[in-house]
Amino acid sequence: MAYEKSTDIFDISRSMFLYPWLEYPDRTKELRKAMAPVHLPLSCYQMPKEEFPPSPECWRQHPSKPNSVPYCYFNKPEIYTHWHDLYDQREEREAEKMLRKMRDDHRYIKEVHQTHIQMFHLPMSKLIIKSEMQSRPLEPTWDPLKWQRLRELTKSLESPREDEQLYAAQALGCLRISDKFVMKALQQVAQTGPEKVQYEAYRTLAILGCLNKHVIRALIKQLKEKNEGQRMETLTGLRMALNSWAAVSKDKRTQVGDEGKLVPVLQTLIKKSSSEASLEAALCLGFLRPRSNMVQEFLLQCLCQGLKTQQMKALRMLVKVMHVHSAPVIRAVLDQLCSSSVLEDRFEATQMLKTIGLEQIQAQGLEELTFNLLRRKTHNEPFLAVRQAVAQTVEELKLKPMMMNLVEAQLMNPDATARQEAVISLGVLGIRSPQVFHLLLDLLDAENRQAVKKSLQETLILCASIDPWIQNKLKNKVLSVYEAPKTNVKAEPTRFRKEPENPEELTIQDFRLAKLNPLFTAKSITKVGQKKTPAFPPYCSKPRKHRPQAIGPWQPRIKKQLRVLAEIAK
C-alpha cells in the first residue's frame, strides 16, 4: 500500500547543512511544516479547578478602585482558560479589562443601553439643514492629505494643458479652502490663463469669498453673455458666494465690489431670463437687497408655479432672509410639508413653522388648517425622523394638549384604520399618563388586526426608548405579535402569553433586543373603494365621513377605561 513518508526535521537540517546549494521543490513548505509547533489540548490535570463556594481570598476590592463594591475576582476570565494557544496575552488583557469594566463601572452599562436606544431613532442632526459651507483657511496639521491635494491642484493651475487648469480651478471651488497661496494662484491664472480657465477661476474666487471689484466685473461680463448654460453656472456660483457672505454678521462683512453695477444686471435678468435663471438672479439680489419689493413680489409668484425644489428655494429666502410671514408663505410651507417628495425639504418645513410662530399663524387665520395638517403628518408621514420633527413643532406651537386629547379619543374608534393612525401618532407625541399606557396594553390584547398590533408594538417600543417609566414597565414583558394558529382555543392576553416554542415566529421578542430601522415606513392602509385624501387640505377641513364599523365584538371594558381617562383629563 502506497504511503507518503513523513519528513524528519533532522534530515532536512542535515541536508541543508551539508548541501546548502541544492534546491528542490517544496523545500520551504516542508521545512515550515516540520518546524510548526504541535498544540495539544490540556490534560485533566492541567485544567483549572473550580472551587464552590470560592475562597474568601477571591472576595476583595480591586486595587485601582478602593471604593467599589467587592466582587469575586479571578486572575483569568473563565471563558479564556480552556485553550492556551487560542488567545495571546494581548487579547487576554483586553478581555480582563472589559470584564472589570462591565462588573465595576455602572456607567458602562448605561452607555451600552443608550447606544442601543439610539438604534430606534434617526438623530435630528442628520436632517438639520446646514448652512452652505463657508470658505476657510486650512492648517497643514489638521488634514495632511487635503493639504497635499491643495498643493497638487495649485501646481496644476500652472500646467500647460488647458483641461488640467480647468479641472484644478473647479476642484478648488469644491474644496472651499481659502488659503493665501490658493487665492494667489487663482488670481494669477485668472489674469493670464485661457478664456475658459479665466471664467472658472473668477467663479471659484467668488465662491471662496473674494468679492472685490475685479471679480465682480468679470462676473458681470459673464452674466451679459448669451450662453445660457454659462450664465446659469455663474449665477449659481454667485448665489453660493452671497449666501456665505450674508451668513456673516454685518459688522464683519467685506464690502461687495461694484455692487451698484451688479444690482441692475440682476434686475434685468429677473425680467428677461428663463424661469430658473430668473429665480437664481432673484436669490442673489435678495441677499444684497433683503427689503426689495421687486424680489419679494417675484418670489411670491414663484410659490404658485414651478417645481417644488424651486419653490423651496424661494421659501428659504422669504422666511429666513426677508422675514416675510404672510398667508401665502404659510400655505406654501404647509404645502411643502404635505406634498414635497424631498425628505430634507419636509423636515425644513417643520423648522420654518417654528420660525413663523403661532402668533403669525393665528393672525393669518390659518391655525385650524395648520393643526389639521400637523395632526395628519404625525401618522401618514413615512419617515420616523420627520414625524418626530412634526411632534416637536406641535409642542413648540403649543398645540400638543389639544392634539393629544383628540388622538387618545381616536383610540376607541371602531374603524381599524383610525385606531392605527392614533397609535402611530402616540409613538411620536408620547404617552402622558399611566392610564393611556395600560389602555394601549389592553388594546394590544383585544385587537384582531395584525397591522394595528404591529403599530401598537412599535409605539410601545419607541416610547420605552425615551421614557424610563415605560421602559421599566416593559422590562420583563415579551411583545409577541405573530400569526396565531387557527384553533378553537381562546388566546391568552399578550402580557401573560408564553413565548412560542419556535422563536422565529416572533417579530420582536424583547424591546431591548429590537433593532428597528430608524427610517421605518408606516404603511398607510387604504380600503377598496375608499377615495385617496388630497395632498393639501382645503382651507376648512371637511368632517370625517362615517366609516363602516369593524367586524367582531369590541371590548366594553376599554370603552369604560377611556371614559375614565377623559374625566381625568378634564
UniProtKB/Swiss-Prot annotation:
The lineage of its organism: Eukaryota, Metazoa, Chordata, Craniata, Vertebrata. The gene is HEATR9. It comes from Macaca fascicularis (Crab-eating macaque). It comes from the Eukaryota. This is Protein HEATR9.
